[in-house]
């Protein structure tokens, strides 16, 4: 008996009309735009929640080095769990239903390692003489952190946000498997209906979102490095 996936692939390759523009036009506002909005919502909320957790943990890890190894160990384990397995674990927890909530929890878990590492790396990149100069001016440790260290570390932190955002946008497509919504819904619906237009539309738009987010955050990262711009000019 032939494999259904192989038969579907053969049908796709033999079908000259991979993109049904009429379907896209008819379903643009009803299906495609809400899917894009849902994907942006999942990604934005996940990055925001992850930042709220990662920034203080990263600062704590930079200040107290004994904290850093166990933090990276735990977040590294979370990062290494396959996405479908993590989704399955989350929805098996009592009180956690399928939908956007477990998807956001999983996406936050995946981005913590990247954000914490970059926060620590950014704070480590601040020259010690700069901190000594700030302390000599009478600034407290809290003032040094918020007025000196974090502003100088911001480009490295934004680089971590950039990597985490692109990662989240990609993994969020799989969240549709547990009714998380987003562009993954188009992809999974297209697979179930054997309708290539939905699959391609979801995949192309998810890729476009990742590229746009990457370029915007790259521009922000370069803007926050005025010394690098000065060297280029």
What are these regions (language model features)?
Residues 183-220:
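Hydrophobic alpha-helical transmembrane segments of polytopic membrane proteins
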Residues 123-153:
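Short helix-to-coil transition segments within interhelical loops
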Residues 221-233:
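Short cytosolic juxtamembrane segments of multi-pass membrane proteins
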Residues 31-42, 91-114, 154, 198, ...:
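Loop-to-helix entry region at the N-terminal start of transmembrane alpha-helices
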Residues 52-57, 102-105, 109-131, 154, ...:
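Membrane-embedded alpha-helices of multi-pass transport/permease systems
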Residues 57-90, 107, 117-121:
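Cytoplasmic-entry segments and transmembrane alpha-helices of multi-pass inner-membrane transporters
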Residues 44, 142-174, 201:
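Transmembrane alpha-helices
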Residues 2-46:
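Periplasmic/extracellular loop-to-transmembrane helix junction in inner-membrane transport proteins
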């Amino acid at each position: 008996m032939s494999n259904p996936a192989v038969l579907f692939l053969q049908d796709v390759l033999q079908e000259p009309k991979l993109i049904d523009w009429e379907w896209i036009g008819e379903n643009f506002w009803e299906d495609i735009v809400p899917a894009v909005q849902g994907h942006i919502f999942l990604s934005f909320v996940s990055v925001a929640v992850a930042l709220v957790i990662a920034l203080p943990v990263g600062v704590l890890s930079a200040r107290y080095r004994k904290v850093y190894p166990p933090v990276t160990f735990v977040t590294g384990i979370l990062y290494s769990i396959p996405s479908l397995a993590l989704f399955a674990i989350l929805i098996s927890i009592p009180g956690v239903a399928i939908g956007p909530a477990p998807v956001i929890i999983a996406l936050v878990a995946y981005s913590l390692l990247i954000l914490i590492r970059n926060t620590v790396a950014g704070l480590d990149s601040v020259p010690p003489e700069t901190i000594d100069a700030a302390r000599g001016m009478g600034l407290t440790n809290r003032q040094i952190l918020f007025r000196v260290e974090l502003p100088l570390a911001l480009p490295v932190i934004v680089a971590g946000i950039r990597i985490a955002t692109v990662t989240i946008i990609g993994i969020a497509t799989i969240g549709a498997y547990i009714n998380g919504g987003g562009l993954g819904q188009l992809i999974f619906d297209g697979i179930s209906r054997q309708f290539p237009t939905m699959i391609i539309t979801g995949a192309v738009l998810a890729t476009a979102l990742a590229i746009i987010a990457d370029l915007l955050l790259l521009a922000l990262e370069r803007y926050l490095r005025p010394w690098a711009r000065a060297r280029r000019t």
